[in-house]
UniProtKB/Swiss-Prot annotation:
One of its GO terms (cellular component) is cytoplasm. Its cofactor is FAD. It comes from Mycoplasma pneumoniae (strain ATCC 29342 / M129 / Subtype 1) (Mycoplasmoides pneumoniae). Belongs to the class-II pyridine nucleotide-disulfide oxidoreductase family. It catalyses: [thioredoxin]-dithiol + NADP(+) = [thioredoxin]-disulfide + NADPH + H(+). This is Thioredoxin reductase. The lineage of its organism: Bacteria, Bacillati, Mycoplasmatota, Mycoplasmoidales, Mycoplasmoidaceae.
């Protein structure tokens, strides 16, 4: 009998072949391949299945779909998985332990899951601006999901911070409904897809603020403006607006495993071998939480498939 924390419930002592933490593209792909390989698996997800895909307006680089909304693609992935009838735990992982050859997963609904192996596919968290009152204005003028909250600001003035694909795609989406979109980027050059960037440049209601960062958030109960600072001459200017959408990068979600002393890269992402196994035997990482150069839907799916097929071969 495996011992667990006294305040957690153990409905049974089933030890799954693999527990998949996260139901984004990596976790869903691992689940589909795992079920088809006859593995007894559990999937743990406390948020909307689909990962960051469901927060994306339009996806135009996923094979088989010339253009599809992120929520629709995420739903199709999820339905494909659910049709295979995996065991699903709709909760968040708060801590992962290992006792001998068995992993113990503590969930925030006070249940516990046991597994021989784990695929950690938690994705990433949006990086915050790092300015005063950011948490205070969350939901009141600060949003990290344009497709979730953009319609609340129809015919209003909004800002998007960032210069990558996410920032440009969400600025395009917001420009279809907002009165004005202010695109704020800390440098001249962009890392975004040139086609999408050119579309944005040609829109009459988009204003570019290059070589600027957000220095201050203005307002009392709700956001009503921001102060920008020039990265070259440090001059400042104020913009009156109703909401800011930061898209300035992401951070790995490693708190549930931080006590395991896993190998991480300098940015805090999990280091794996080519089979997606971390420095702890039996613990695999897949998708955006893994240390790698490219983070795309396709690369996440690749990670999940490799991880679960490796597990199939070793169990």
């Amino acid at each position: 009998m495996l011992k667990v924390k006294s305040d957690f419930l153990t409905k049974d002592q089933v030890i799954y072949d693999v527990a998949i933490v996260g139901a984004g593209p990596a976790g869903i792909a691992a689940g589909i391949y795992g079920k088809r390989a006859n593995l007894n698996l559990a999937i743990i997800e406390g948020s909307t299945p689909g990962g960051k895909v469901v927060k994306t307006n339009i996806v135009e680089n996923y094979p088989g779909y010339k253009s599809i909304t992120g929520p629709d693609l995420g739903l199709e992935m999820y339905n494909h998985l659910i049709d295979l009838e995996p065991t699903f735990f709709y909760a968040n992982l708060i801590k992962l332990d290992k006792a001998a050859d068995t992993f113990i997963l503590y969930l925030d609904d006070k249940t516990v899951v046991f597994a021989k192996t784990v695929i950690y596919a938690t994705g990433m968290l949006e990086r915050k601006l790092g300015v005063a009152k950011e948490d205070h204005f969350y939901g009141k003028g600060i949003s990290y999901c344009a497709i979730c909250d953009g319609s609340l600001y129809k015919d209003q003035v909004v800002g998007v911070v960032g210069g990558g694909n996410s920032a440009i795609q969400e600025a395009l989406y917001l420009a279809s409904m907002a009165k004005t979109v202010h695109l704020i980027h800390r440098r001249e050059g962009f890392r975004a897809d040139e086609t999408a960037l050119n579309k944005l440049r040609n829109l009459p209601n988009v204003v570019f603020h290059l070589n600027y960062t957000v220095k201050e958030l203005l307002g009392n109960n709700t956001l009503n403006g921001i102060v920008l600072q020039n990265t070259l001459d440090h001059s400042t200017k104020q913009i009156d607006l109703n909401c800011v959408f930061p898209y300035i990068g992401f951070e790995s979600i490693t708190k549930p495993v931080e006590h395991l002393n896993l190998k991480l890269d300098p940015q805090g992402f999990l280091i794996t071998n080519e089979q997606m196994e971390t420095s702890l035997k039996g613990l695999f990482a897949a998708g955006d939480c893994r240390s790698k150069h490219f983070r795309q839907i396709g690369t996440a799916i690749n990670d999940g498939i490799i991880a679960v097929l490796t597990i199939r071969d070793v169990l």
